[in-house]
A protein has these predicted regions:
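Active-site and substrate-binding clefts of carbohydrate-active enzymes
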Residues: 2-32, 39-41, 158-169, 176, ...
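Catalytic domains of cell-wall/extracellular-matrix polysaccharide-remodeling enzymes
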Residues: 100-157, 222-236
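Acidic (Asp/Glu-rich), glycine- and aromatic
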Residues: 406-407, 484, 492-539, 634-643
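Beta-strand-rich recognition/accessory modules
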Residues: 370-375, 463-482, 496-498, 562-643
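Acidic-aromatic substrate-binding/catalytic surfaces of carbohydrate-active enzymes
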Residues: 24-25, 96, 100, 389-463, ...
Length: 643
């Protein structure tokens, strides 16, 4: 008689923002009661997966739990899975980083509980066929993948096997929703299992009649807390002891005794339940991370940054100890939650760690400021990378704006903005509006894209030695399709940039328009539980105005924008950074805060700061505007000494 084996699995996720308090709370609600139950029920099997931060926490704060795990492992009741130490999306990493993170967690598990893992779990079940080689090289024999990532015809409650380039690894599908909280929880669970098996057996057998089958059940935290608090595992244990055809087991034990494996080939996949980018997004078209990054601009930007810093670290040769320190920061910054969540705090933490990795490499006294040109984000168009003493910036050819701005002191990306829909938000986004369009724009309403914000700029001049870049673009403006040309010049230095605009009317009619330069400064330390705002000051002649950044300028100035502005200063007092914009000619000015929500919660905040001029240009003529952009460190206020 064939037996159906049940393997219960708990696979928590980790992020770089996990605190000791959060891990302690999880221990008290999950691991402590579960450990007690398993110790008193030796016939009940359970499989754990611990990200790297969990293992480190137990070693420091709860060594008694690791001692208990050792005893449970010795009697073949518990198995601990391996994986990547910092829960990255594995297919995105270079081979050195893949193997390094896998080996790091395996070594930590072996040192902590005395046994090297043979099974593997990947964050978000993010899979690529090339991972077979990495997993086998690192000593893994099988991997768990969510059933939604596997072709339905292969889901027969049997282990699968996949080969790639001469190496093979077994795959155990992981299932959900096998239980309902009814009065007869245990009996209903057993009945549901039996019905599932009968349904599968009606399909016919592949190799032999009545093979043993395994159902790996993934328990999420709320369900596991409920099961433990109501002692539902105890009821299940009694049913399993009375039921001869259904038992609990471990994937490793089943692997040794099972002879049937179905062949499968999975090119790339991802567990869609981890995607938290947009509550209105249709995830049916997203079947891999590569499709995800094409759908969400913020994901692609962070992914490009991860690849770039990974390249810097892996190519560094001077100091092995420095390289290892930088690599540790790189691995922490590769955490997958920053890529799969709309939360700006998780993304900013990844940018922070990546900038710290680059900063470690820069401190070897061989760093030189540079301006380089290459395809940074793999879109087929060159970007311009500015590695200055105090910051890192990426200037995009499409739109000619700054799409990434990482400050070394603050180590966060101030250009981390969510897409506007029609154009990419960043710093020095160029618009040319009609009166009606600008009326909508200043009120935060849809106002088209201002033409130049989405136009590809062509390179006019590129000087690495002088850190100079000139871009040019041609567009058609208004209903009459007037031909206008905009030349944009960047002079890049250690503390900022000088940006020069030359707007030329190439049509045969006078050009009357509004030239607007929009800069979106992201909140790098945004906390939805305690929302804070940047400080904003404007100067006109000798008069200084302090603006309340919690609401738009129009709302607090009787629906009027500011005129004759000489300079604008937006300050992140918490990060100790200020940004100053000084036009060569007095400008008009509007400001408003922009927030993004997910499930009715604010997850991102940007401060939209726009300088604009009314322009009137005769045919064949041009005008010039220049903005001096400066990044400065704020002096921290010293508290008086108490004597």
């Amino acid at each position: 008689m064939a037996t159906t084996f049940i393997s219960f699995i708990y696979r928590p996720t980790s992020s770089s923002l996990d605190t000791t308090e959060l891990l302690e709370k999880e221990y008290q609600k999950i691991y402590k009661p579960l450990g007690k139950f398993l110790f008193t029920h030796p016939d009940f099997h359970f499989t754990f997966y611990f990200p790297g931060n969990r293992i480190q926490f137990y070693k420091k704060k709860r060594p008694e739990f690791l001692t208990l795990l050792k005893q449970l492992i010795e009697r073949n009741q518990v198995e601990v899975l391996g994986g990547a130490f910092y829960d990255p999306l594995m297919p995105l990493l270079f081979t050195a980083d893949r193997n390094g993170q896998l080996d790091l967690l395996s070594a930590e598990i072996r040192q902590s509980i005395g046994k090297r893992p043979r099974g593997c779990s990947l964050y978000a079940d993010c899979w690529d066929s090339s991972l077979v080689n990495n997993l086998v090289t690192c000593g893994f024999e099988y991997i768990l993948l969510d059933s939604s990532c596997i072709p339905a015809k292969k889901l027969n409650y049997l282990p699968l096997i996949m080969s790639n380039l001469g190496k093979a690894i077994e795959i155990f599908p992981v299932y959900h929703n096998f239980y309902e909280y009814t009065e007869n929880f245990a009996d209903d669970f057993i009945l549901k299992i039996q019905k599932k098996i009968v349904k599968i057996e009606r399909k016919g057998q592949l190799f032999q009649p009545n093979p043993d089958r395994i159902i790996c059940i993934d328990l999420d935290r709320p369900d596991l807390e409920k099961i433990l608090s109501e002692d539902l595992f105890g009821a299940l244990g009694k049913c399993f002891s009375d039921e001869l055809e259904i038992k609990t087991t471990l994937p490793s034990i089943f692997k040794k005794n099972s002879g049937i494996k179905e062949s499968v080939y999975i090119t790339e996949t991802i567990n869609k339940s981890y995607l938290q980018m947009d509550e209105n997004a249709a995830t049916s078209d997203i079947n891999s991370f590569y499709e995800l990054q094409e759908a969400y601009e913020s994901v692609k930007k962070l992914f490009s940054r991860i690849l770039y810093v990974g390249m810097l670290v892996n190519q560094y040769k001077s100091d092995k100890m420095r390289k290892n320190c930088a690599r540790e920061k790189l691995w922490q910054g590769q955490n997958g939650q920053g890529l799969l969540s709309a939360s700006s705090s998780l993304r900013q933490q990844s940018y922070k760690l990546l900038m710290e990795a680059e900063k470690i490499l820069r401190e070897d006294n061989t760093f030189k400021e540079s301006l380089t040109c290459f395809d940074y984000n793999s879109d087929g168009i060159n970007e311009y990378i500015c590695r200055m003493q105090n910051y890192f910036a990426c200037i995009a050819s499409v739109g000619g704006s700054i799409q990434e701005l990482d400050i070394l002191k603050n180590t966060g990306n101030y250009a981390d903005n969510l897409a506007n829909g029609t154009y990419s938000r960043g710093l020095f986004v160029d618009h040319i509006f009609t009166e009606n369009q600008f009326q909508n724009y200043k009120e935060g309403l849809p106002a088209d894209d201002g033409i130049f914000s989405r136009v590809p700029y062509s390179q006019i001049k590129f000087s690495q030695s002088h850190h100079e870049l000139q871009l040019g673009a041609t567009a058609r403006f208004g209903t009459s399709k007037q031909r206008v040309y905009l030349r944009k010049k960047f002079l890049i230095n250690s503390t900022g940039m000088i940006i020069q605009y030359i707007l030329r009317n190439d049509s045969d009619k006078p050009l009357n328009a509004i030239l607007a330069v929009e800069s979106n400064i992201a909140h790098t330390k945004f906390n939805p539980e305690a929302i804070s705002y940047y400080n904003l000051e404007t100067a006109t002649d000798d008069q200084k105005n302090i603006i309340d950044t919690s609401k738009s300028l129009l709302a607090q100035n009787k629906n009027q924008y500011f005129n004759n502005i000489d300079s604008i200063r937006l300050s992140d007092t918490e990060g100790g950074i200020s940004f100053t914009f000084e036009p060569n000619e007095k400008s008009h000015y509007i400001y408003y805060p922009l927030v993004s929500e997910l499930n009715s919660k604010i997850v991102h905040m940007t401060f939209v700061s726009t300088m604009f001029w009314d322009v009137s240009i005769e045919p064949g003529k041009e005008i010039e505007k220049t903005i001096n952009f400066t990044i400065t460190n704020l002096k921290k206020e010293r508290k008086p000494k108490i004597t």
